[in-house]
Amino acid sequence: MVYNDFLKLAKSSIQERIYVGEGSLDTYRENVETFKSEHSDIIEKYSLTEPELFVMFMMLINNSDEIQQCASSGNGTPFAKECVRQYDSFLSKVPISDNAIFYGLDPSDRVENYVNISTFNYKRYMIASTRQSIFDNLKNGVKYIINKRRIDKTKAHEVMWWNDANNTKTICFERNTKFEINRLDRINKIIELTEL
């Protein structure tokens, strides 16, 4: 999709529903322009498009609820559906993570959802980190410790590989990644998973 058409779709979505957030459309556009000026080598190397970068920033800045809902259900506004398409494309282009263990969160805080199952299909995009300290001071949410598949089979992509401060990487698993539950700690709400 051409970037101007993508932005028109974003604007129409904002008018239907405050979707991208009050004033955020300009912020995301500015983020894309800054990224283009500072990382043209990355854009060229991975053939990234402006709509893909726009959605990447939406996902990284935690304005992704409707994108995640659309990713898991297939239902959503035309803009949400386009965002899912663009983010799928983005993930298909960016590097696979070479880390073996990741740390993620399920904000639902419902560890009992995992008690009677051995595997599950995570329909949304799972955002994770290579840094365990994301668990520090966490009061709510189920904590995931994720063991990755072999590097040639994993669906874990590095989504901020150009800016890994302190060797910390932000990872995103493709939607519909399947996981096996290895260990469940109901008291501390920690689930150890293996990507299947």
Residues of each region from the PLM?
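Mono-ADP-ribosyltransferase
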Residues: 1-196
